[in-house]
From Swiss-Prot:
Domain of life: Eukaryota
One example GO MF annotation: proton-transporting ATP synthase activity, rotational mechanism
Primary localisation category: mitochondrion
Organism name: Dictyostelium discoideum
Keywords: ATP synthesis, CF(1), Hydrogen ion transport, Ion transport, Membrane, Mitochondrion, Mitochondrion inner membrane, Transit peptide, Transport
Protein name in UniProt: ATP synthase F(1) complex subunit gamma, mitochondrial
Record flagged with keyword Manganese: no
Membrane topology: Peripheral membrane protein
PANTHER family: ATP SYNTHASE GAMMA CHAIN (PTHR11693), ATP SYNTHASE SUBUNIT GAMMA, MITOCHONDRIAL (PTHR11693:SF22)
Length: 306
């Protein structure tokens, strides 16, 4: 074996091969982390820009549910329902539950809080038959997995930036066609407070049967001769208005949560990149030092053998 061949054997030692494999793995992982960090930064900027318009629409949609709420005396109706001792005539013991979730993830605990609230309501209330509908894909699987017999439908196409009131009405018509005689409805969504804060909110909407408990207050208003039909229409309109408001409130909360989540992910990515960079440089320096030592040792051994 000549001198060059002996030197190649030294450089191709198992220790050097292991070091090269470690460096390659570190380099691949470092590149992956940097790529993901770029993606999270982009998502943060997108969520930040969308939050402005979502916040504006959430504020504008708020008053839509205030008027019907005052007319129907929802607070008094809810109290009467909770404290009623006499059987309610034609009561169906059916409550509609509408959970507003998102179509996409990476938005913190927004969907988890809604699903947790829905499951708690389904487990705790044994007096009523609660039927659940959802908007957004993220709420379907967790609810269907635990309560398949109580799930009605999922409303799609509500994850986009804008949607019309008729779209909300079509979704509600589909629900009401399946459960025409319901006692009450509950819309559960994330109420937007600011860019760093939101909380789960519940909007109670009485059905026609429960409105009868508060009919004296309602009859103070001048209506058409068919007051029962008017009350039913107002109840359904209030349900649509509450869902309309909840959708925009939830979207603003989604954008705020995604902005915070992606900002935290970007910061974590930078920390991991720095740590991997230091680890890579140390491993590379150690490999170079080891190779130099082996080269010098190999050269000395070759000279001695010659």
């Amino acid at each position: 074996m000549n001198s060059a061949s002996k030197l190649f054997v030294v450089l191709a030692s198992p220790a050097n091969q292991r070091n090269m494999a470690t460096l390659k793995d570190l380099k691949i992982r470092l590149g992956t982390v940097k790529t993901i960090s770029k993606l999270t930064k982009t998502l943060h900027m997108v969520a930040s820009s969308k939050l402005r318009s979502a916040e504006k629409k959430a504020e504008e949609s708020g008053p839509y549910s205030v008027g019907p709420q005052k007319v129907l005396g929802v607070v008094e109706t809810a109290d009467a329902f909770n404290t009623a001792t006499e059987p309610i005539e034609d009561r169906s013991n059916k409550q509609l539950l509408i959970a507003i979730t998102t179509d996409t993830g990476m938005c913190g605990p927004v969907n988890h809080q809604i699903i947790k609230t829905i499951k708690a309501l389904l487990k705790d209330d044994a007096k009523q038959e609660i039927l659940v509908s959802t908007t957004g894909l993220k709420g379907v699987a967790p609810i269907v997995a635990d309560f398949p017999n109580q799930f009605l439908i999922n409303g799609r196409d509500f994850g986009k930036a804008d949607y019309s009131f008729p779209e909300v009405l079509l979704f509600l018509n589909e629900i009401i066609s399946k459960v025409p005689n319901y006692d009450s409805a509950l819309v559960v969504y994330n109420k937007f407070k600011n860019a760093l804060s939101y909380s789960v909110d519940r909007q109670f909407i009485p059905g026609f049967n429960l409105l009868e408990l508060n009919r004296d207050k309602f009859y103070e208003y001048t209506t058409s001769e068919d007051r029962a039909a008017t009350m039913k229409d107002l109840s359904e309109f209030y349900l649509a208005s509450s869902l309309w408001t909840g959708l925009y409130q939830n979207r603003a909360s989604e954008m705020a949560a995604r902005m915070v989540a992606m900002d935290n992910a970007s910061k974590n990515g930078e920390s991991i990149s720095q740590a991997l960079g230091l680890q890579y440089n140390r491993a590379r320096q150690a490999m170079i030092t080891s190779e130099l030592i082996e080269i010098v040792s190999g050269a000395s051994a070759i000279e001695s053998s010659d």
